């Protein structure tokens, strides 16, 4: 049995989503050198911690890997693809992990924001058609997202994230009550209920073109329009 300690820390006032995550993760990650971060509306696979910790150990010194993600879209896996994992550009904030050096490389303020406008199209090709809008909305005060700033740092540094082929996380927040989640979602996944504890990884840290298209396709304009229509259908 592992010995565990639970530490609680309460804020005297609501700091907001972005500030709370940034300050909380910074405190933990600077103490332990790495962190696994969860939200309270996530359902975890039985092997979630095995997957996350193995990824953290395996890619600790591989700085081209920016994060380990527990959630995965329902990707179309090629028949000749034999690994349990794949690399993709855009990180996921639904059950994820990273290391202190990568976390502390993020520019959270982006004070010289105007110089990044020329990267709008490239950023969207890299991570999906909604990337620049979310980043610009944050800058304009229309959202408090820390995650899009994390993704932008990853984009600027040309780094990747590790994902499971079968998701180790399921988001249970699509009841319309969550801050950023609606009742219907295109992100329902194939959830791993297996007892598998050892995972296989690609030999090289590189993007598989087919898996990339399948994963990033969830953020395409067509998918987003369809999702918006379905959201309105499910409202009534």
Please provide the spans of the model-predicted regions.
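An acidic/histidine-cluster motif and surrounding catalytic segment
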Residues: 3-37, 42-236
């Amino acid at each position: 049995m592992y010995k565990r300690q639970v530490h609680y820390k309460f804020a005297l006032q609501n700091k907001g989503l972005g500030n709370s995550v940034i300050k909380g993760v910074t405190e933990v990650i600077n103490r332990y050198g790495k962190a696994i971060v969860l939200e309270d509306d996530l359902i975890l696979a039985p092997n979630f911690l095995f997957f996350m910790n193995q990824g953290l150990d395996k890619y600790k010194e591989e700085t081209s890997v920016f994060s380990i993600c527990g959630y995965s879209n329902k990707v179309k896996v090629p028949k000749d693809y034999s690994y349990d994992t794949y690399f993709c550009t855009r990180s996921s904030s639904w059950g994820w992990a990273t290391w202190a050096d990568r976390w502390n490389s993020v520019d959270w303020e982006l004070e010289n924001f105007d110089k990044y406008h020329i990267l709008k199209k490239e950023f969207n090709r890299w991570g999906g058609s909604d990337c620049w809008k979310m980043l610009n909305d944050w800058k304009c005060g229309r959202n408090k997202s820390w995650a899009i700033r994390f993704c932008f740092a990853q984009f600027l540094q040309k780094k990747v994230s590790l994902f499971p082929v079968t998701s180790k996380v399921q988001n249970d927040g699509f009841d319309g009550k969550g801050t950023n989640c609606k009742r219907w979602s295109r992100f329902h996944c194939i959830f791993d209920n297996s007892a598998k504890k050892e995972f296989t990884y690609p030999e090289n840290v590189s993007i598989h073109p087919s898996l990339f298209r399948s994963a990033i396709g969830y953020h395409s304009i067509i998918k987003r329009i369809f999702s918006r229509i379905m959201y309105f259908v499910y409202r009534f």
